[in-house]
Design a protein with these regions (language model features):
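Terminal amphipathic alpha-helical/low-complexity segments used for targeting or macromolecular assembly
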Residues: 1-45, 84, 98-103, 111, ...
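Flexible, glycine/small-residue-enriched loop-and-beta-strand segment within the central core
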Residues: 26, 53-63, 68-138, 164-165, ...
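C-terminal/domain-terminus segments
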Residues: 136-169
Length: 175
């Protein structure tokens, strides 16, 4: 049955108008969330899944209440998104990496390395547009990831990070 909902999602629902559009956007989001509730491990109440979100087979994805995934995001199978998370468009959460240690073999012939390290985004986080989260990291509760950042390590709770690689800018509690 899950395969049927994947077919409906990728063949139809993902192409519907964005959730930001009045009336038709809400209906489109409702269809996408309807499919996600039958695909994901957990899909909370009042969630937003915007158009063209790619999540593979989605079987291990968890998304909490009042959270949203922006347009054109990539969310791999081993991702946990907690409550009240805002994910801007084109965020990529990476699950794979290329092997490159053997210099006698071209990198393109060294198999991609599937990681089973989960990525967790804590409650009340904001992930800026076009950010990249590398595998196996935790974004602490209340954190903000600046637009275009590349997160290569865990982010402490209530920390604003930015850059490539992302570095702490300041705490949300003041300077």
């Amino acid at each position: 049955m899950k395969k049927l909902y994947l077919l409906i999602y990728y063949g139809f629902a993902t192409h519907l108008p964005g959730s930001y559009m009045p009336v038709v956007g809400r209906m489109s989001n409702a269809i996408r969330v309807f499919c996600a509730k039958r695909i994901f491990k957990k899909c909370g109440k009042i969630t937003t899944i915007d158009r063209h979100v790619y999540f593979g087979n989605g079987s291990e994805i968890e998304i909490g209440d009042y959270s949203g995934i922006g347009e054109n995001c990539v969310v791999p199978h081993n991702t946990r998104i907690c409550r009240y998370v805002m994910m801007a468009p084109e965020v990529h959460i990476v699950a794979n990496n290329h092997k490159f240690a053997d210099t006698s073999i071209p990198m393109c012939f060294q198999k991609a390395e599937q990681t089973h390290l989960p990525t967790t985004i804590g409650d009340d986080c904001w992930i800026g547009v076009r950010s990249i989260l590398t595998p196996g990291h935790t974004i602490g509760q209340g954190s903000i990831i600046a637009a275009g950042s590349v997160v290569t390590h865990d982010v402490q709770p209530y920390t604003i990070v930015g850059g490539n690689p992302a570095k702490p800018i300041r705490s949300r509690f003041g300077r």
